[in-house]
Amino acid sequence: MRSRAWPLLIVAVALACGPVPGGSLAGEVRPPPAAWSEVIDGDRAICEIESRPADPHSIQLECFVRDGALYVQSHRWALASWWPVTSWAAIWIEHPETRVRIGDAIYELRAERVTAPAERGAVLAARGYDPVPDGIVLFRFAPRT
């Protein structure tokens, strides 16, 4: 009986140890680079992203570069009505002004939801999804205007 409890305990602990949102990010604000390869080693990096300036909310996500653009993606249930909390993806849809920290630098960017089927499909297929599932929310970062 004890041997059956260990896998359940491990799963429970793993689920409880998810990313914990934080508040405002600190660091030097810099203009967005001409090419994200100037600041990201390879094609991906862990980024800290702050949104909702009136009530700052920050999280860590894997950012990735594709065709020169910087992206992030949600899990496939981020906007599901049954999801127990308001996901960062829902927050960004309402408040797209973000601050992205990579290393010590902060870039003030706009998180643009990618809904065009061709771009969304190509980016998520390059991430290994075959077929590309519904529900994943994809954002491309753009300079603020």
Q: What is the role of each PLM region?
A:
Residues 39-41, 66, 132-134:
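Short, surface-exposed loop and linker segments with low hydrophobicity and enrichment for Pro/Ser/Thr
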Residues 1-7:
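Bacterial N-terminal signal peptides that target proteins for export
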Residues 18-56:
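Short, conserved active-site entrance elements at the starts or edges of catalytic domains
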Residues 13-16:
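C-terminal motif of bacterial Sec signal peptides marking the signal peptidase cleavage site
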